[in-house]
Swiss-Prot record:
<dbReference type="GO" id="GO:2000044">
    <property type="term" value="P:negative regulation of cardiac cell fate specification"/>
</dbReference>
<keyword id="KW-0879">Wnt signaling pathway</keyword>
<dbReference type="InterPro" id="IPR018161">
    <property type="entry name" value="Wnt_CS"/>
</dbReference>
<feature type="disulfide bond">
    <location>
        <begin position="115"/>
        <end position="133"/>
    </location>
</feature>
<dbReference type="InterPro" id="IPR013301">
    <property type="entry name" value="Wnt8"/>
</dbReference>
<keyword id="KW-0325">Glycoprotein</keyword>
<feature type="disulfide bond">
    <location>
        <begin position="276"/>
        <end position="291"/>
    </location>
</feature>
<keyword id="KW-0964">Secreted</keyword>
<dbReference type="Pfam" id="PF00110">
    <property type="entry name" value="wnt"/>
</dbReference>
<dbReference type="GO" id="GO:0007498">
    <property type="term" value="P:mesoderm development"/>
</dbReference>
<keyword id="KW-0449">Lipoprotein</keyword>
<dbReference type="GO" id="GO:0060070">
    <property type="term" value="P:canonical Wnt signaling pathway"/>
</dbReference>
<feature type="disulfide bond">
    <location>
        <begin position="260"/>
        <end position="298"/>
    </location>
</feature>
<feature type="glycosylation site" description="N-linked (GlcNAc...) asparagine">
    <location>
        <position position="282"/>
    </location>
</feature>
<feature type="disulfide bond">
    <location>
        <begin position="295"/>
        <end position="337"/>
    </location>
</feature>
<dbReference type="GO" id="GO:0016055">
    <property type="term" value="P:Wnt signaling pathway"/>
</dbReference>
<feature type="disulfide bond">
    <location>
        <begin position="181"/>
        <end position="195"/>
    </location>
</feature>
Amino acid sequence: MQNTTLFILATLLIFCPFFTASAWSVNNFLMTGPKAYLTYSASVAVGAQNGIEECKYQFAWERWNCPESTLQLATHNGLRSATRETSFVHAISSAGVMYTLTRNCSMGDFDNCGCDDSRNGRIGGRGWVWGGCSDNAEFGERISKLFVDGLETGQDARALMNLHNNEAGRLAVKETMKRTCKCHGISGSCSIQTCWLQLAEFRDIGNHLKIKHDQALKLEMDKRKMRSGNSADNRGAIADAFSSVAGSELIFLEDSPDYCLKNISLGLQGTEGRECLQSGKNLSQWERRSCKRLCTDCGLRVEEKKTEIISSCNCKFHWCCTVKCEQCKQVVIKHFCARRERDSNMLNTKRKNRGHRR
């Protein structure tokens, strides 16, 4: 995890000098050049990593489970596909960067940034006025756009798709913000309230974008235009296609491959060997169906394995001042996707035959 974060940070610093100083002056920043980017780069790296971790959570029991190869987005080797899943990776990574920058700004981690008090004193609605310390989402959005969108240098349909989904991620941060209020009045009568906007939990943003992923729109596009945006005609046609979609919606251009199957060229491991859930407390219906989705619907069987877990238990405090625990063993039953026995036997036979030929 730490190595991944450092790799993201190093790559961002490599690409940062391509931003122009004029872009910074427009936004009234106190610094220009590489120093300014260094100020925010640590937050950007953490935000990108948080986005990937949220992706793994949201897709933990899906056939595509946000594998490590998705980090190619942050390192700008490029997610070559333009699938529904790619759209989510761009959106959640962009949201993660904006979220972390906004939160760090409100916490006073940056010298040139603080709370958003631009609306303070204005009447917000019946019985309440704007006040307090609103999270500065505008700042987070602006810096996130410079860093994340700045990595997208192409002009073809795939590049525009990535930029659109980056923006959808930032909009998700703003759309999920919550109004928090404090009451004022004699003896707590709450005759008037002072309210401010706060960031939602990042899990709420992940849930929001997961729904957007499930409802993502496919844009039908000429494959030649997807690869080439150089001509004015191509750029115009691509721009027209994108303009019909709301900025908060996720879009994709290509159908997803079969994630049941292993495909080395695409970096897909398939679902064989994946764990699934059949029983347990507080499982959602989606989680309970994971064995069907990952195993049986992919032509695999569900294999039951018993695992022994050793953990501390019956801990007691002894004066003074130690805690002594017993070591307890617990057998846990887990379920995994495995090949059907007939398929495994056929595979073993083929391997033996190859061995004899050698």
